[in-house]
């Protein structure tokens, strides 16, 4: 979410800070979770149900890594994309803020479905994809109708950010689909 906001404001420092603030902590945690889940699956002789839970945790970890890469991609694009209303915090010409907010909620609900075993969270995540698709379609149509020779590079960059946010929502649906 921070990388989306930073890209809409053209704030490269903010975008990169989203990942620098505790990069070592995140890497250490990822390493520990990845290795612990692998060790449990391989060496602990888990029962079928426990093995499935650990396997699902590893799947979520891998999907979260993809989400992190998308966030990095968005942050990297911040310096190359210019939005018309960067000074007005509440103007969002392409719906990126609501897309980011909804996607963040989708990710949270998908992981909650795993943790709580509540399939309602997973189902809600899948339903929220309709909102994301609507926002994406609206932004896509706006970009497509306003592109010209002078702004094609910038509009393509904005479209690329929209694609990354939508892809993050799709990943949350992929996680959620395992728990419906």
Where are these regions (language model features)?
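Cytosolic, long alpha-helical scaffolding segments
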Residues: 1-180
């Amino acid at each position: 979410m921070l990388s989306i906001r930073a890209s809409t404001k053209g704030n490269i420092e903010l975008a990169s800070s989203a990942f620098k603030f505790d990069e070592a902590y995140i890497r250490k945690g990822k390493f520990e979770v990845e290795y612990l889940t692998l060790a449990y699956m391989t060496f602990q002789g888990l029962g079928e149900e426990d093995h499935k839970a650990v396997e699902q945790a590893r799947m979520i970890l891998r999907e979260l890594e993809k989400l992190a890469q998308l966030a990095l991609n968005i942050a990297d694009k911040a310096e190359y994309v210019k939005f018309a209303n960067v000074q007005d915090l509440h103007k969002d010409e392409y719906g990126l803020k609501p897309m980011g907010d909804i996607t963040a909620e989708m990710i949270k609900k998908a992981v909650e479905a795993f943790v709580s075993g509540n399939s309602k969270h997973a189902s809600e995540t899948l339903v929220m994809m309709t909102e994301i698709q609507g926002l994406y379609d609206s932004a896509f149509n706006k970009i497509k109708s306003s592109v010209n020779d002078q702004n094609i590079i910038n509009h393509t960059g904005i479209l690329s950010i929209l694609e990354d946010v939508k892809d993050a929502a799709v990943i949350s649906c992929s996680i959620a689909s395992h728990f419906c």
